[in-house]
């Protein structure tokens, strides 16, 4: 009976360790996805902030050549 208890505790312990590792990997993956989304948003903001400069440059060229 004692051998069975020890085996059961060992299986439960290893299962908990495995579950903990999986949860940690899942959290890391979610953080990486979140960071990637933030990078995409910041790139979009940088591009959108350039649009007024591009428009004014095109307008000045149109006035100069037009």
Swiss-Prot record:
A GO cellular component entry from the record: membrane
Biased composition annotated in UniProt, kind: Acidic residues: 30-41
Entry's pH dependence statement: Optimum pH is <7. Is active against E.coli ATCC25922 at pH 5 (MIC=50 uM), whereas is not active at pH 7 (MIC>200 uM).
Propeptide cleavage-removed residue intervals: 23-46
Region called Disordered, residue ranges: 25-44
Domain of life: Eukaryota
Chief location of this protein within or outside the cell: secreted
InterPro entries according to UniProt: Frog_antimicrobial_propeptide (IPR004275), FSAP (IPR016322)
Tissue-specificity statement: Expressed by the skin glands.
Signal keyword on record: yes
One Pfam entry name: FSAP_sig_propep
Protein's cellular compartments: Secreted; Target cell membrane
Cleaved signal peptide residues: 1-22
Residue numbers carrying Phenylalanine amide: 65
Any single GO BP term: innate immune response
Keyword terms: Amidation, Amphibian defense peptide, Cleavage on pair of basic residues, Immunity, Innate immunity, Membrane, Secreted, Signal, Target cell membrane, Target membrane
General function of this protein: Antimicrobial peptide with activity against the Gram-positive S.pyogenes (MIC=12.5 uM), but not against all other bacteria tested (both Gram-positive and Gram-negative). Does not show activity against fungi, and against Leishmania species.
Similarity comment: Belongs to the frog skin active peptide (FSAP) family. Phylloseptin subfamily.
Name of the protein: Phylloseptin-S3
Originating species: Phyllomedusa sauvagei (Sauvage's leaf frog)
């Amino acid at each position: 009976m004692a051998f069975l208890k020890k085996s059961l505790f060992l299986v439960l312990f290893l299962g908990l360790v495995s579950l903990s590792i999986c949860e940690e990997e899942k959290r890391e993956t979610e953080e990486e996805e979140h960071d990637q989304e933030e990078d995409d948003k910041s790139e979009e903001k940088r591009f959108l902030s350039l649009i007024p400069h591009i428009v004014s440059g095109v307008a000045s060229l149109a006035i100069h050549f037009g």
